[in-house]
């Protein structure tokens, strides 16, 4: 077995000068799976698994970044994730990598315990959540994105049919830039309350009757859905800007209906 000479200094190739003089806007690690815990609206802690993307800006004269430091950052941050801890984590990454700009993004399944509307039976429903932060020239922006599955029912189908109406599962995706702390549950509630009906993991027959009739009494086109959710986001001071999408997986077509609204509330409409 070869023994390393204790006097030998391993070269740091990444820190050498690059003569091509081309800056790299984003360089780092992608799709790193790592356990994390998140704080819920009620103050409980929920264990989950995050898929992380971490990157920084690399100056034109620097050959490479220090890839191991990204993973080391995850190992050092095992405390339950909050918006403030996430902000501090972003600042720590820039310090460790000696970078002027960088971005962290983590996507994870988030579970909410829901109570069925009639029977009261409880079950979990999962939502896809992404927390992202980017820092540049001392300015830090944080984003909270959640994909909410809901039910939509077609107003036209209801109007022209003697009975019944076609309905389907839909996805409402809210990507909000935060002006203040905003619980994941708050965005979930907005999407579910503005849909024809929300979803549950477990329903009994009386519950199925309720959700069927609830959707029938609250029909919405995909245009109605995004506009109603947008009104709620416009009224929420915790949201500075947003990209809002709705996709209906049409039950009578082999394609989806889709709508998008994008707004920065800091700018005049």
From Swiss-Prot:
State the top-level EC class: hydrolase
What the entry lists under PANTHER family is as follows: GTP CYCLOHYDROLASE MPTA
What are the site positions for May be catalytically important? 154
Query: What UniProt keywords apply to this chain's record, in alphabetical order?
Result: Hydrolase
Question: Organism, per UniProt?
Answer: Burkholderia lata (strain ATCC 17760 / DSM 23089 / LMG 22485 / NCIMB 9086 / R18194 / 383)
Q: Does the keyword Hydrolase apply?
A: yes
Q: Which reaction does it catalyse?
A: GTP + H2O = 7,8-dihydroneopterin 3'-triphosphate + formate + H(+)
Q: What is its EC number?
A: 3.5.4.16
Q: Does the keyword Hydrolase apply?
A: yes
Report the family membership.
Belongs to the GTP cyclohydrolase IV family.
Please report the name of this protein according to its UniProt entry: GTP cyclohydrolase FolE2 2
The GO annotation for biological process reads: tetrahydrofolate biosynthetic process
UniProt pathway annotation: Cofactor biosynthesis; 7,8-dihydroneopterin triphosphate biosynthesis; 7,8-dihydroneopterin triphosphate from GTP: step 1/1
Q: One GO MF term, please?
A: GTP cyclohydrolase I activity
- Reported function: Converts GTP to 7,8-dihydroneopterin triphosphate.
> Which InterPro entries does the record cross-reference, listed alphabetically?
GTP_cyclohydrolase_FolE2, GTP_cyclohydrolase_FolE2/MptA
């Amino acid at each position: 077995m070869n023994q390393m000479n204790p006097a030998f200094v391993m070269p740091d190739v990444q820190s050498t000068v690059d003569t091509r003089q081309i800056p790299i806007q984003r360089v780092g690690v992608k799709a790193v799976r790592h356990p994390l815990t998140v704080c819920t609206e009620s103050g409980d802690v929920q264990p989950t698994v995050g898929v992380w993307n971490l990157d920084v800006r690399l100056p034109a004269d620097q050959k490479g970044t220090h890839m191991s430091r990204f993973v080391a950052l995850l190992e050092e941050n095992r405390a339950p994730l909050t918006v403030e801890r996430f902000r501090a984590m972003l600042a720590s990454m820039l310090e460790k990598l000696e970078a002027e700009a960088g971005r962290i993004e983590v996507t994870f399944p988030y579970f909410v315990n829901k109570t069925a509307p009639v029977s009261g039976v409880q079950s979990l429903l999962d939502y896809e959540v992404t927390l992202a932060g980017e820092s540049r020239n001392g300015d830090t922006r944080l984003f909270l994105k959640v994909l909410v599955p809901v039910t939509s029912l077609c107003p036209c189908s209801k109007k022209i049919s003697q009975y019944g109406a076609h309905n389907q599962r839909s996805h409402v995706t809210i990507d909000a830039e935060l002006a203040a702390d905003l619980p994941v549950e708050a965005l979930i509630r907005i999407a579910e309350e503005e849909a024809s009906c929300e979803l549950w993991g477990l329903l009994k027959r009386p519950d199925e009757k309720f959700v069927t009739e609830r959707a029938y009494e609250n029909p919405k086109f995909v245009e109605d859905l995004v506009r109603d959710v947008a009104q709620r986001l416009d009224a929420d001071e915790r949201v500075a800007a947003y990209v809002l999408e709705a996709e209906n997986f049409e039950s009578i077509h082999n394609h989806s209906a889709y709508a998008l609204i994008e707004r920065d509330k800091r700018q005049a409409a």
